[in-house]
UniProtKB/Swiss-Prot annotation:
This is Catalase-peroxidase. Formation of the three residue Trp-Tyr-Met cross-link is important for the catalase, but not the peroxidase activity of the enzyme. PANTHER family: CATALASE-PEROXIDASE (PTHR30555:SF0), HYDROPEROXIDASE I, BIFUNCTIONAL CATALASE-PEROXIDASE (PTHR30555). It comes from Hahella chejuensis (strain KCTC 2396). The record marks R87 as: Transition state stabilizer. Its cofactor is heme b. It comes from the Bacteria. GO terms for biological process: cellular response to hydrogen peroxide; hydrogen peroxide catabolic process.
Amino acid sequence: MSDSKCPFHHAPAEGTSNRDWWPNQLRLEILHQRSALSNPLGEEFNYAEAFKSLDLAAIKQDLTALMTDSQDWWPADFGHYGPLFIRMAWHSAGTYRTGDGRGGGGTGNQRFAPLNSWPDNVNLDKARRLLWPIKQKYGQKISWADLMILAGNVALESMGFKTFGFGGGRADIWEPEQDIYWGAEKTWLDDNRYSGDRDLENPLAAVQMGLIYVNPEGPNGNPDPVAAAKDIRETFARMAMDDEETVALIAGGHTFGKTHGAGDAANVGPEPEAAGLEEQGLGWRSSYGSGKAGDAITSGLEVTWTETPTQWSNNFFENLFGYEWELTKSPAGAHQWVPKGGAGADKIPDAHDPSKRHVPTMLTTDLSLRFDPAYEKISRRFYENPDQLADAFARAWFKLTHRDMGPRARYLGPEVPAEELIWQDPIPAVDHPLINDQDISALKSKILTSGLSVAQMVSTAWASASTFRGSDMRGGANGARIRLAPQNEWEVNQPDQLAQVLKTLEGVQAEFNSAQSDGKKVSLADIIVLAGCAGVEKAAQNAGHTIKVPFSPGRMDASQEQTDIEAFEVLEPIADGFRNYMKGKYAVSPEELLVDRAQLLTLTAPEMTVLIGGMRVLNANVGQSKHGVFTQRPESLTNDFFVNLLDMGTVWKATSKEEDLFEGRDRVTGDLKWTGTRIDLVFGSNSQLRALAEVYASSDAQERFLKDFVAAWTKVMNLDRFDLA
């Protein structure tokens, strides 16, 4: 047999895929990520418990020793790896964006494509490889996600900076994330994400494909500090940072280390995902000189900001304001800045050769902090008050590295700061006895006789709970923030009806609490969810079934003062397919937005399907729309949605130019039977969703439908109950 003839069949991944044939196919696979099948630790492994057994002081001691243990295969700049680990931690956390809560350092995703091969992450593969002996030593007591952030903290501390604290609890993923939209560009560093007057596409935060933030040379490489400031402000705002936090982060981070642009980037080899097997997961092998140390090429910029690049100081601002700056180019040809007239000669040490000295250098984006009027005021204040910079940087760094973790209740370890911060969406701790089963039954009876409809009870509970985002663990029913601004004004929450429902439920709450003599109380947050559970039980009873929906008390009510209105505005749904709601018309289809919301709610495709079917017959659409209410007995928890959707006696036809509304008519008589949206009809159109709908439309499905709906409903109601985990 010829050596060129393989006797085996093609590998499973070879050949043309369904997506090659049908590029617009609904991406349901994003609902089935993080499967136990890909996790080598098994479903029984509890990372939080494992982390609690970690000797944090010991691992920090090992990390501190690593900082100055320079390795020949990748020597430390200035004899200290601290700046490299700061960059690694920063770039791990810095992909977070507020628009959908995705990105960030909470999963260790920097280990996988595309992030492990982004142009902005050049040579961070070396940082993670330097950490491997420590990860190997402590095993599963610390995740890669936690270790990368902790290494950044220890790096700062080892260089004389006092950090604000550290919270562990970031569990690793084991495969690349498929749900994150990084942009539509097909080429690294393209910026097709802009339209109009440099309007950045939502939910993106970075200015170019493959960058964490902004182009350090300026917009599209144009070295204009004032124009760059506009990009900086937009990008950092989309990461939940205000101007003061932005200035502190840039100045604080650039107090340490250097950038690398010793030679032409053409000397740099392929990124890790494209490198050969012999590279063993490393990438960017450079043929320029030794390819490392003083010959390293990373960004193409060759900048060292301060005279003490491995010690905390105020020298960044001293240099920024102490010199006038002129444009030059790095050895790699990138735009950067040096003091005019040769000032500052020999001020800056060389990273590897003690006999060499350099002038201070700055990036275009560094000069933005001086030449943008708003940034300049903050920068000058920090320049004149170094203690304010230290405090602001400590707090901003903590926010950067913890913003995607959700409430403070999820933080683990002895270094969690005691101070409660507004961006952590604080909720008061339980300070009273909780209601028992007898109380729950009595409260449900009160709610059911209060005059509220099933639809009102269910839709209000759903509105409260479904703000949850599994991406950054924000939102949810705990806190009862649905009664506060901005949620009580959102169109999707039907403010007028919401106010009436809340008034009724507050009456039930007040009556119960005033009747207690032992300090027992029920929160409005619990009452809202309990009302939804009562509504589901009532709807099942209407359909001839007796069920009990699980309910766990223990939620508390947040105050308006504990609620950052601007921070919560990003949680407003532009679409909620579960309530058949679209705020406007978008380039993305309603069914894609449904899948996206289901993914944020951590739902599987079967859970999404059964919830849609149940919510429709419960009459929970926004505005009481009849679209998708495929039943003659609304507010009865039946499988009618599926039965009638799959009925071949109905012929469907679009009734709008955009094909977002449809009517279903009797195949024989032509009489109008139903109306529906794309979200409704996709469960009969998409082959995968139709297969699920068929399960619930079958004649033996009612019991399964009830059980599965209640399970999925309970899951959503408890998504933010980290105390129950």
